[in-house]
Structures are given as C-alpha cells and as structure tokens.
Amino acid sequence: NPKLKVGMVGAHVAVDSYQSMKVGSAVDWVAGNEFDFTVKEVADGLPYENIDGLAWRRSNGEIVRNKSRAILENMDALPHVVDVYKRDLTIEDYFIGYLPHPYLSVYTGRGCKSRCTFCLWPQTIGGHVYRTRSVEHVVSEMAKAQQYFPQVREFFFDDDTFTDNLPRAVEIAKGLGKLGIKW
C-alpha cells in the first residue's frame, strides 16, 4: 500500500538517523531521541518539514534531517500511558519471564545523571539529566491502572534510575501504599 507510511524509533535510529534511512527505501521516517511528540505530530498529519526530531525521505528519495527536538523538561506533560494501554492493548498478550503475569510497565522519569560506559539509554534517548514526573502524576496514574487492570499482578517502573531521587521514591511509595499497592 503506497499510502502506508513506515516509521522507526529507538536507540539505533536516535544515534544514526541518516544511516538508518539510507539502508533501504522502505522506511519513510525515523524519530530520534525522545520521540513522543515527534510521532504524535506525524500521526496528526503535520508536514514532515515542520516536525522537530524527524528524519524523513522526500518523494525523490532525498533524506532530510530536521532540527533536533528539545528534551522534554516537564514530564507531567506526557499523558498517562495506562489510558493508551486500556484503549489499545490486551495486557495479557505481553509477557516477560522475570515478572509475574500479567504485569504493567510504566515510566516515572527519564534520563540518568550518571555516565556509566556500559549503559546506552542516557547516551541515546534519555539524556544525562534525570527528569521526573511529579509524585501526584505517578500516583494518579497508578490509581487509574488499578481501576483499569485489576488483574495485574505487578506494576513495573521501568525508569533508568527510579531511586536516584530517594525522597521522591519514598513519597511515591507512600502514595502507592495509600492505594493498597504493596511495595
């Protein structure tokens, strides 16, 4: 279907968007680094040339790299992902062997101030500043998650460094305790 557009996100295309586009003509665009709002703008139908953080292919095959998208500072600007899960996913279809099934994965922050040489995420997507959602934003999402998915056996915070801000982690734990979520 020539009207179907194919896009890619992730660590590899964040590091080398041009080469990722160059290897084949099947990919129409790639979104680098934090791609949330870049992909939303693609889905909203904005012209590719107006979307920060996007590399894309013109109809003549030329690859264009737009300016980078700024790192998201206000993490509370992101919508609750559990609303998307409820709308689009059957969570029982997803399995990770080391987590009780079914589980639900949520990010409460991004980035990491450390500079570990073995870790690719801060270098490719999240950056070296740990930016977090507010305690209230996280706890309100977890309350929704309990309501939407009572069958969940484990909530998994997939942050790079959840305990980097220990007082915040303690406040989230207290909020989860008030919801009856075992910590």
Residue ranges and their predicted role:
Residues 1-74:
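Glycine-rich beta-alpha loop elements in corrinoid/cobalamin-binding modules
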Residues 48-51, 57-105:
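N-terminal [4Fe-4S]-dependent radical SAM core
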Residues 80-183:
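Radical SAM [4Fe-4S] cluster-binding motif and immediate context
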